[in-house]
Amino acid sequence: MSSIKSHNTLSELYKIFYSRSTKIVLPIVFIFQPLLSYISSKQILAVGLNATPETNSSLVEPIPPIEYIGFEAILLGLFAMIILGAILGSMEYKNSSLRTSLLLCSNKAVFFVTKFFVTSVFIFIVSFVSIYLSIASAQFGLEREGLSPLILSNNVWYFILLGSLSWSLLTVLSYSIAFYFKSSLGSLLFLLPQVYNLGSFLADRIQLAKYLPVSLGQDLIATSPLKITTPGRSVLFLSTWVLVISSFAYYKFLKEDVGNGR
């Protein structure tokens, strides 16, 4: 039984790594986003770390403290990760892939849990590494004014962890929605408009909209000292979204006829 689980775990990893979407997204989050973060920090250094709208008319708000610099850039990667989650979630239903996978592991419950676990761990690792590279690049761009890119600070490591949780939970949610609907379209229609400021627009006007997934996730990204206010609440409610949707996907998967899966 353990050998079957190990084989199934490796199979899931291979499918993720060799997916075309993974090959596209990884360069975005590992190379392009850190580069953007570096360029942004250079621009901040040119303006001045103490600049405010009063001293520089091009600024809308004051430059945030050093520990918060770089986190604005990771919103780009969040967009890419949500798309990746949606594609990975719907991937099993393409070209009868699901039926082929179940030949390796006929126990649908074990198959789903293994697949969900492997995907979640992969997503968290990618999220953490990407965000670290982006923040390290930003601090490197600040030259002597910045923190050591290797050591950073306790607060920055805490912010990186929160950002990684935000990315991971939103990406796994995107994955679960796509798995439930057997298509990436549901995830993209529900989550991407929220990333494009729709979530913030609604949250500013409707109290309940603050509990939309992307709004909760963005509350975990330390773009300014005003942002990280109730991280425990945000993680709790965002985790609840993931738990509920993934449970629906799980029970639907157990009951459906895989032969008619598409």
Place the predicted regions along the sequence by residue.
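Alpha-helical transmembrane segments of multi-pass membrane transporters/permeases
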Residues: S184-P193
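Aromatic- and glycine-rich beta-strand/loop motifs that create alpha-glucan
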Residues: M1-F30
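Transmembrane helix boundary and interhelical loop/hinge segments in multi-pass membrane proteins
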Residues: I83-L104, K108-A109, F116
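Junction motif at the cytosolic side of a transmembrane helix
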Residues: K15, T240-R262
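Secretory targeting signals
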Residues: S21-T22, L26-L88, F112-Y180, N197-S200, ...
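Membrane-interfacial segments
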Residues: Q43-G48, Y93, S97, S137, ...
